[in-house]
Amino acid sequence: MDPLIDPCVFVDDDGQAYIYNGGGQICKGGKLKDNMVELDGEMKEMEGLEDFHEATWIHKYNGKYYLSYSDNHDENWNDGVKGDNRMRYAISDNPLGPWKSMGIYMEPTDSYTNHGSIVNFKGQWFAFYHNS
């Protein structure tokens, strides 16, 4: 397995575990074996993501898979300096895609990078992220 940047593990309703990671504008995902330390097949590139940078997170809502990630902050340059990361998301009917980019769900915080997680806790949805 290649080195992992910002790995994320998602366990689906049927108990199947998946691992995702990404950096350098490429996001990959793959099935894990039951021991959750070995791949069950090859990692594959996640298709359909727009401006992917890093910080992959997967959650499932109403039968759809949501992949959220930090973008390359290419559109929000300020005086020739790259701006801060925004959080984007994409949806799919399959945990390994293909994905349909849905846009930005959070503008930059006061931190150059961002990494978010969306979780359900006691029936309520929360988005976690970091800033300075």
Predicted regions and their residues:
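Carbohydrate-active catalytic/glycan-binding domains of CAZyme proteins
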Residues: M1-S132
